[in-house]
Every structure is written in structure tokens, then in C-alpha cells.
Amino acid sequence: MRLLLIDHGCCDVPDTRVHHCREHLEKLGVQASACGPSSISHLASHQPGLHGIHLHDVAAASKLFLRAVQDGTPIALLEALATISPSLLGLVRETARQMVAEAVDANLPDVIFVFHAGILTDLAIETGVPVVVHVSFSDLVVAGRNGFMRQRVTAAIASCNGIVATDADTAQALRQEWLSDDVHSPDEQVPIVIWPPSPNSAADILAVCQCALSRRQYRA
């Protein structure tokens, strides 16, 4: 099985969560690649299977967003994206879209697994590949502050073939405030799995991605 892991946090530092998950997935026989914001403006050398989204040049237009990119954490990026101007957000989306598309073309993943519900979840859906999203409560809080972001994140989550919530409170919020019963019939609703993210989540990621792929194939 081929998986593309997308994180809203820095992806090119060896001790990051996405790196640990990728390594553990490969031990399970999965061909795993990774995509996410880069900690530097350009990678010093190409790392096979790693697709860094270089946002530093775009972020230079906003001190707040530049600090978030330099910070490298998912929450910093998501919070900054909810506050930047529509024009800058458009530039960020286009930059990220190109790299996500490149990662998909290069690795031909069976499923995309996205850490956090945000702009990259939306772009993953656009590729047409089955998508699983891992949602934390903070993702929903941040997206809820911006009308455009809430609209995009809501549509993205509803379009996913698999949904994982960090905890029961997040799952409840998703069901009550983000996933409308009118969108799908009961038979089409995607069940929400609950488990917290960790660098050792490889087996859980593989299981939920296998279910998502089966669900997509069944509906096809």
C-alpha cells in the first residue's frame, strides 16, 4: 500500500511526528511519503519521498505568518492562516497546491492521511485521492474564527473517506457542529474513529487508511 502523509507542521526535521510515522509505516511494509511545510526556504538536498512546502518567501509579506512558518508547529500555522488577508491566503493555497499535486504525481498514493483539519486537507481532497483526516479540537476552534476557513474545512471534512478525532469531545463537536446529517444518507456517513496522534500511530494510520480505501472502492 502507498500512503502520502501530509502534516500542517514542519515535515523536514528528522524528529518530527510525520517522520516517525513514515518510518514505522515502512516497517509495516507500507510505501510512505511525506508532505508539509519546510523549516527552511529551500531544502539543502532532495530527500526521497519528502516534499517540503516552501512558504518563507510568501510569508515575508506578513510578520505574523512568517513567525508561524518559522515556528513550525501545526497550531501556529493554522492560527496564522485564519488571520491573514484573502490575497495572501490565495498565494499560500497556490504554493501548497502545487507541492501537494507534485507529491501525489511522484508517489501515486492509494490514500492520503492528513494531520489536522486545515488548508492542506482541502487541497488533499482536490487531488481526487481518498483522504483520511485526523482532527484535533484546536483545529475546529481555529477554523471557526474565519468564515472562509470554516467553509473550506467543513467541506473538506465532509468529503473525507475517513475521519479520526483526537478525543470524544472532538468527535462530538464534529457530529454536532461540522458534519450535517443532510450531507449523506446514514449508509454513506463516515464513522469517526477516536485515537490521539503520536509518533507511534503507524498501525492505527494503516488500519484507518485501509478502511477508507475499501469504502471508496465500495462506493465506486
Task: Name the predicted role of every residue range.
Residues 111-114, 124-142:
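Active-site proximal beta-strand in glycosyltransferases
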Residues 1-56, 205-206:
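N-terminal subdomain of nucleotide-sugar transferases
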Residues 161-187:
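A short, active-site helix/loop in glycosyltransferases that binds the activated sugar's phosphate group
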Residues 89, 100-118:
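Short N-terminal targeting/anchoring amphipathic segment
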Residues 34-99:
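A conserved catalytic-core segment of Leloir-type glycosyltransferases
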